Amino acid sequence: MFYLLGLRLLKYITFRMAYATIFAFLLSLIIGPHIILRLKKLRVDQVLREDGPKRHLSEKAGIPTMGGILIFFCVFISLVFWSNILNVYFLIMLFVMLGFAFLGFIDDFLKIKKKTSDGLKARFKIYGQIIFSFISVGTLYYFGSEHVSMIYFPFIKSFRIDLGLFYIPFGMFILISASNSFNLTDGLDGLAIGLSIVITGALIIIAYLTSRADFAAYLHIPNIKGSEELVIFLGALLGGSFGFLWFNAYPAKIMMGDTGSLALGAILGMAALIVKSEILFSILAGVFIIETMSVIIQVMVYKKTKKRVFKMAPLHHHFEELGWSEMQVVIRFWIIGLIFAIIALSTIKIR
């Protein structure tokens, strides 16, 4: 809204990004307690898995879920004020946010209604993810930059692969994988949102560099015209995420639920597609990939041998079972996530 006023100051990406971040963060702090209280009154409590860590059954009982509502409401309001709402990348990101959040909301709602940890059936969830990812990636393919179907590789300056139409299923795979990986990792207070903040910060830097022709030419990365609005979008997401972490830090007052985790993964996955950092995203999301692989390995090995590789999966529960405190697991995983982000960002220059 402010952008459309045409004020000169609002043409500066860094200014709008900074205030989109601050606006979303402060709004979260203001309305967060009211949303938490409202969810408690509605008895929208986190439904805990019986096969999870036993101490969670007592420690996390009664904590309201659907906290993704808080994140994305604050992000949306901030974007209305600070973003160019006519930008194609803004519209794609908004669609991904609302679509996957809606899917997660249905999942959370069914869990609460049935009072079990089984919400939306897996096949219906994946159908929804396929539909939303196909629409969003397809739109990106037809309205994106001239680089849209190109895959760029870290450490290699000039080598790239043009996937053509096959970029659509490739992009869909990234969105769906990211969405589900973030969902699996959301099991401890502050874990998933803290890692998301690290990735969001890294993608803001990448999006800013790709939006500037001078930086893009110097670093030998594609110049994505219009991607400056992605910087604003991610800035608002960063602020909303920090605001949510304020209440989600141990001991959590609210959980993001599938409403938050399914959408967060998809949003960051789409951001990586827009700025042509698909391969780089696999480094940025290293902790999420490791968490997902721990579940896959656990299931596959147990089916064949009836033995478990880990004491419990995903991996963060394994370390809890080894005696690590919840905060130790969370902070150490944050540190590892930050290291992955530093490695990913360093590859931009090392070409």
Curated annotation (Swiss-Prot):
Its cofactor is: Mg(2+)
Instruction: Provide a GO CC annotation, any one.
Output: plasma membrane
EC no. given is: 2.7.8.13
Q: Which HAMAP family does its entry note?
A: MraY
Q: Which domain of life is it from?
A: Bacteria
Q: Where are the transmembrane segments?
A: 17-37, 62-82, 85-105, 124-144, 161-181, 190-210, 230-250, 254-274, 279-299, 328-348
Its function?
Catalyzes the initial step of the lipid cycle reactions in the biosynthesis of the cell wall peptidoglycan: transfers peptidoglycan precursor phospho-MurNAc-pentapeptide from UDP-MurNAc-pentapeptide onto the lipid carrier undecaprenyl phosphate, yielding undecaprenyl-pyrophosphoryl-MurNAc-pentapeptide, known as lipid I.
Family from the record: Belongs to the glycosyltransferase 4 family. MraY subfamily.
Metabolic or biological pathway: Cell wall biogenesis; peptidoglycan biosynthesis
Gene Ontology BP term (one): cell division
List keywords of the entry alphabetically. Cell cycle, Cell division, Cell inner membrane, Cell membrane, Cell shape, Cell wall biogenesis/degradation, Magnesium, Membrane, Metal-binding, Peptidoglycan synthesis, Transferase, Transmembrane, Transmembrane helix
Q: Select a single GO molecular function from the record's annotations and give it.
A: phospho-N-acetylmuramoyl-pentapeptide-transferase activity
| Major enzyme class | transferase
Q: What is the species listed in this Swiss-Prot or TrEMBL entry?
A: Borrelia garinii subsp. bavariensis (strain ATCC BAA-2496 / DSM 23469 / PBi)
Name assigned to this protein: Phospho-N-acetylmuramoyl-pentapeptide-transferase
Q: Where in the cell is it found?
A: Cell inner membrane
Q: Which Pfam families match?
A: Glycos_transf_4, MraY_sig1
